[in-house]
């Protein structure tokens, strides 16, 4: 610790200032002694000239350096004497290269313009070969190729226009082959393909069994049958939704004539559906309403059976059950729906309307299939 305190006491500002002055003084003394010994050696040395050295030259400025550039070195090459004239004016002293300008320099040549450069292009390499016989120019490309240009080249030919190039296309490659039916039939019989068993569109439509769809007499097309040949004048536009809704006959829900009902419902499946609706609606009806409806029905049946004769009153009235057996199912349903009151009658009407609408959709679907088949036959 005592050593550190003694060393730290020496690093005071006064001691540091004295140390700095001592270093500066030693540098000055050594520099003076060195310069005096150098002068002594220059005067008494045998290799020295004995004269005072020349003062140092000022470094040239940037302008002097730019002015000293000799542009004669960048002129276009002259005859063989240029290299000799350049080497003749070079004076080598030690390791320095001094270039002196030529006292009689040649005049500078003007650089060639763009037009002169374009004119200097030898177009003889790009001329088209003379092909008078119509032979392929590519086959004689090696014979016409010459590394040395012709001393007296022929005048340049005009480049072919777009029309000439189009006319030069050989269309024989694109001609269709002549059709020979005998050869094609023979090739067809000798080399059958594996696509013969695939049915066409017409073959796919023919197997459709149209007998499943029953068409009413008013919607059936005119002709001997469904499969008869029909030549329609043109394709008709498919009916819109509004036309389909308008085509639904709502008057059939309030008819009581059995003949009209038999024409509109020839399908036995629909009869079964109507029986089911009738049984369901009758099960929900009260007994009094049913009796009232049956009495009205017996009265109408007796009026129809009498036909205004006097002997009809003498006969015993038929029972309601016998009348119901003789009447078709559609008539029963419509009478029950027409004479029904309340919610039961509304349900029966709604179910009948839904059945009619489904039948119309089936008929329209069958009609579209028939039109598509006729279109395929026409094509």
Curated annotation (Swiss-Prot):
Q: What is this protein called?
A: Pathogen-associated molecular patterns-induced protein A70
The annotated topology with respect to the bilayer is: Single-pass membrane protein
Sites carrying a glycan are: 122, 170
Bias-annotated ranges (Polar residues): 221-231
What is its subcellular localisation?
Answer: Membrane
Q: Where is the composition biased (Basic and acidic residues)?
A: 137-149, 256-285, 322-335
Its keywords, alphabetically, are:
Glycoprotein, Membrane, Transmembrane, Transmembrane helix
Entry superkingdom: Eukaryota
Q: What induces it?
A: Rapidly induced in local tissues by both compatible and incompatible P.syringae pv. tomato DC3000 strains. Accumulates transiently in systemic tissue after challenge with incompatible P.syringae pv. tomato DC3000(avrRpm1) strain but not with a compatible strains; this systemic induction is abolished by a treatment with the calcium ion channel blocker LaCl(3), thus being dependent of a cytoplasmic calcium burst. Triggered by jasmonic acid (JA) and wounding.
Q: Which N-terminal residues, if any, form the signal peptide?
A: none
- Primary location group: membrane
Q: Which Pfam families match?
A: DUF4408, DUF761
The portions of this protein that span the membrane are 7-29
Q: GO annotations under biological process?
A: defense response to bacterium; response to bacterium; response to jasmonic acid; response to wounding
Cellular component per GO, a single term: membrane
What are the boundaries of the region Disordered? 133-154, 216-238, 256-347
